[in-house]
């Protein structure tokens, strides 16, 4: 790295876990009572706040998990208007060994062999560092 270059800074927004939270209760759940469900509520979307206010100089990547690639690419487009650098999409059944890197100007599949000892995240981060 050139000594005048600043190191790359990236934020990754994990899918699903950042979409919902447990609905707040006003009292403790009594352990003697039976219950069979937990209510979830949507959390506010914070991508615009990250890109505009908190971390405007950082490359922000959002994850999108879907059941088919066409949905991933279509849904990814809305994130670019919110200032993200890219969207990392994965399909439910292939998520451990294949991702789709969606940038404003290109879409690229990144994959490893299913039985490979490496992890897709390692390959993905190396790819992003080389952008």
Regions found by a protein language model. Give the residues of each.
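Small-residue (G/A/S/T)-rich helix-start motifs and N-terminal tracts that mark the onset
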Residues: 1-6, 84, 91-131
């Amino acid at each position: 790295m050139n000594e005048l270059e600043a190191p790359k800074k990236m934020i990754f927004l994990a899918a699903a876990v950042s979409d919902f939270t447990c609905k707040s209760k006003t009292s403790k759940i009594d352990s003697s009572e039976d219950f069979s469900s937990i209510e979830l509520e949507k959390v506010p979307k914070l991508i615009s706040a990250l890109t505009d206010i908190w971390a405007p100089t950082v490359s922000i990547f959002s994850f999108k998990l879907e059941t088919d690639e066409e949905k991933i690419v279509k849904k990814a487009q809305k994130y670019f208007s919110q200032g993200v650098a890219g969207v990392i999409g994965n399909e439910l059944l292939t998520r451990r060994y294949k991702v789709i890197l969606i940038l404003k100007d290109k879409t690229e599949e990144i994959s490893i062999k299913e039985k490979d000892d490496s992890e897709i995240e390692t390959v993905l981060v190396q790819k992003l560092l080389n952008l």
